Structures are given as C-alpha cells and as structure tokens.
Amino acid sequence: MIKYVHTNFIHKKKLNVYNYERSENMKPKYQVIIEDIKSKILSGDYSMGEQIPTESVMQETYGVSRHTVRKAILELSNEGFLRSEKGSGTYVSNQYQSKASGASANKTIGVITTYISDYIFPSIIRGIESRLNKDNYSLLLASTNNDVEQEKKALEMMLSYGVDGLIVEPTKSNLYNPNISYYLSFKEQDVPFTMINAYYEELEVPFFCLDDVQSSYLATNELISKGHTQIGLIAKMDDLQGKYRMKGYIKALGDAKLRFQPEHILSFNTETKLDLYANLKEFLTENQDEMTALVCYNDEVGLEVVNVCRQLGISIPDKLSIIGQDNSYIAKNATINLTTLTHPQEQMGHDAADWIIKKLQGKKDLPNETYYQPVLVEGETIKELTAKRDEVR
C-alpha cells in the first residue's frame, strides 16, 4: 500500500521516493538562507569547524534583517549543521552527521536515477529493491529528471539523511557536472557509492554499464549484414550512453569500409527531446530517397521513428529499416515487432545493490567496472536487401 504524504513525497514500506520534478513555491527568506548554507556545508564549500560569515555580513549578502539571519542560524544549529560560540562566532558543526546516522540506523541505501516510472527504470529499481530486501535494507529513492539542479537537491537530501550507501545514475553524464563536490563529500565520509548506466569520467567510481559501444556496433552491423549501406543514426549527446553508442556506429561503418556521412546523423539532448518528433519528420523527409536504415538511440526513439514514418507514409521495413536498443517493455508491448538489443535492467539493479551491501560488509576485491554484453533480439523492422548485400561482399 502506498501512502501519499504530500505532492513531492511518496512513502512505501521500505521505499521512500522524493521527486523534484515540480518547481518549488516561494520560500520564506530564512529558509533560503538555511538551504544555501546547508548546500555549502554538504558540498564542502564550508569545511568542518570553519567559521561562517558574521550576522552583519549575512544581512548584507541576503538582503534580510538580523532577525531573519538569527532565525536561520538557530534552525541550522538545532539540526546540527552549526554551533555558536559566545563572543567568537558561528562555526560549521558535524553534529548533523551523527543525527543522520541515528536516522538511518535502520540501514538505508540511497538511489538516484534520472527517471523513476519511465522506460527501463522500473525494472532497474525492482532489481535494486529485491536485493536490498534480502538483507533488510530500506531504499530512499530520488529522481533528477536529468537536470543537474535536481541532482544537487537529491544529493543534499542523501547527505543530510545520512544514507549508508548510494547508487546513482548520472545526470547528463557526457557534460561537465557541477555537483562533483557532493560526490567527493560522500568519499570523504566513507559512504560507498556506485553508478549505473553511465559514470562521471572525472571521478574514479565503480560502475555497472551496458557495453554501449558494442550495442550500437551490433545494431549497425545487423543492418550492414542485411545489405544496407546508407545507414543513419539518432543519437542523444548529453548522456555518456549516446557518446558510446555513436562510437559503436562509427566503428561498424569503418569495419565494413562504409563512409561516415554527417548528414545521416540526427542528434538531440534532454532539452530538445520534446522537439524530436518535428525534427525527425524533417530529417526523414530530407533523407528518405537515399537512407535505407536507421540505428536508434533506444527503443523509445525507435518507436517515435515508427510514428513519424506512419504520418509520412514511409513503410517499415519496406522503405526504411530500423533497430532500437535496450529491449524495453515499451518495445515488447508495441504494435510493431521492433528489432532491438538487450539491456540488463533488473540484473544491473540487483548487481549494483549487491556491490553496495558487500562493500558495507567489508568485502574486498570488488569489481570497479562491470560491463554487460548486449544480445540481438530479432523483430520485424529490418528488410534484407539481397542485391546490395551481394555488392558489399
């Protein structure tokens, strides 16, 4: 049974979910100060024992009254983030960590994913939860909507709560991430964490990932083996998966001695995803006379291509062959039998949770890198071009 406490919080036995997808209402000024100072402490901008600015400086910085500043300091002191010394000033305290440790005495693992209810994420979370339940761990779950500000809030929540370990799916993993300092704070506090689906290349962190290069390589090679030589790619470029899937596509073309054609690439990111339908329509219209096949970033994109082709009157696979990636439930339940490749999903979640538990148990020699190999799932969206295949041979 799920109990709804308020709009941004869902509580379930052994599962707490925080969702930051809604914009926050206007906050009282003292609350703004509290959140800013907490953020500086949790990210390491203010170190333990460091004196924070004086009340008068804070008045000027935040444009508030002395009363508002004192109210914020009192609240932060009560929560264990600050301590005041008469005649000396106010300093960063570590009492919040001991309070948090008490709060998480029931053994809690934090999980941060980009999304919760979409695509392959329910399966991944199910795998995590099933493994944690075996050792009586609770799960504290947050989503970022692939937005770094929401990731920041999720990390602050995990640090404040004092989770015993953390499993993270990175946000916009192919771009610079401004929240690296929070991950370093977890390291400094000896809180084990691992990443799934991708990782931040700036950090040395254990991870569990599909071999995305191989996935896209196999997808492209499957089309080549069916005689296709004019093959396009739909790529998402703000996530590391997109970078490596493009790499696999380029490698497969090179191995087959086929020319890479930039005009056959359509890229998008989180912000432009809403425009993908319109952009696909233009892209397919411009290339339909030459391009015979498409490697899609994932199944979701593949099915969007199907929708656009229906509107444009492009028959799949007679006029255009397509292949997805991830073997998601939406592909399995689609009206068209999409050719795709596997993703570990639930197994990945289980293995990441198992790694965290073993780390907390003091186990040594745990893997730093785990790659899962994709397998082709044959569908009905690829046409064999026999004559062209013979020409390639």
Model-derived segments and their meaning:
Residues D36, K281-R393:
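Flexible loop/turn connectors
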Residues N133-S143, L233, A252-L274:
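Short beta-strand elements in bilobed, periplasmic/extracellular small-molecule ligand-binding domains
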Residues Y217-L258, E263, N368-I382:
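An alpha-beta-alpha
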Residues E204-L233, K243, K251, K273-E282, ...:
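Hydrophobic alpha-helical segments within soluble ligand-binding/sensing domains
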Residues I2-A103:
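N-terminal helix-turn-helix DNA-binding module of bacterial transcription factors
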